[in-house]
């Protein structure tokens, strides 16, 4: 069984096209896939994580994602590489959802289809559903309960990738009942982790910005999980064991019992 990095580039994928244990999933949707896709890929829309992380919600989501994977012919025994239009906003959350459902080997193609140098295939791809049962990994998605339980835990980096104004409660979204940040979080602008849209900076630069050693555990959050999804792509590319907290401040701010700092 071949190893799979958390993030791969076009050269890595080109060298392995056609390998029998490699499945390439296009998360952009079936219409976009039909208009043009990486050779050998299939449409694989898994959706987005929910804004609330109640246990029953996460458990049901894991089952639903497992069903979607089976409908798209994904068994869990393959290496699964996901790509989007190029910014990571679609592929990175989809990767965490596949992990939540129990898929053990999932990667994201950095730069997505925009970075693919070869001619695209066109036309619809026929899917063959499979009958397998994945074992959910509920820990793949950080929840507000996990984040609260682990506040101040040595070795865990809690990374806020919002603006300085949001972090210090000098600005923010009016839909949030409270402003500030999760206690103990450090802040980095999401854009500081990238050289361009969907193109993470070199691993050494990202690690210098984060200030933690390669392999450290990082939970990233923002307002509603989009910026932190992109940040998670850069963090994983830099060698961190990174997860995106999809509920982010949108969820945390709604629970008056949860602490905050300004």
Predicted regions and their residues:
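Short clusters of hydrophobic/aromatic residues that line enzyme substrate/ligand-binding pockets
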Residues: 120, 167, 260
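Positively charged, proline/Ser/Thr-rich regional signature most characteristic
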Residues: 2-76, 150-216, 254
């Amino acid at each position: 069984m071949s190893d799979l990095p958390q993030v791969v580039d076009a050269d890595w994928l080109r060298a392995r096209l056609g390998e029998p244990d490699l499945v390439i999933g296009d998360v952009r949707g079936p219409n976009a896939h039909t208009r043009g896709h990486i050779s050998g890929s299939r449409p694989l829309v898994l959706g987005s994580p929910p804004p609330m992380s109640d246990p029953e919600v996460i458990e049901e989501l894991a089952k639903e994602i497992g069903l979607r994977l089976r409908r798209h012919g994904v068994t869990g025994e393959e290496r699964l590489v996901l790509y989007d239009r190029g910014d990571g906003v679609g592929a990175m959350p989809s990767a965490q959802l596949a992990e939540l459902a129990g898929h053990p080997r999932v990667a994201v193609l950095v730069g997505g289809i925009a970075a693919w140098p070869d001619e695209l295939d066109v036309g619809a791809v026929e899917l063959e559903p499979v009958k397998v049962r994945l074992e959910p990994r509920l820990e793949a998605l950080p929840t507000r309960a996990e984040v609260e339980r682990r506040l101040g835990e040595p070795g865990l980096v809690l990374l806020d990738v919002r603006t300085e104004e949001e972090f210090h409660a000098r600005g923010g979204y009016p839909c949030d009942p409270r402003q500030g940040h999760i206690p103990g979080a450090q802040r980095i602008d999401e854009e500081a982790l990238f050289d361009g849209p969907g193109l993470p900076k070199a691993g050494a630069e990202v690690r210098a910005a984060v200030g933690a050693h390669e392999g450290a555990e990082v939970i990233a959050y923002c307002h509603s999980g989009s910026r932190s999804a992109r940040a998670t792509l850069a963090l994983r590319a830099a060698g961190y064991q990174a997860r995106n907290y999809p509920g982010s401040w949108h969820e945390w701010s709604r629970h008056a019992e949860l602490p905050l700092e300004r």
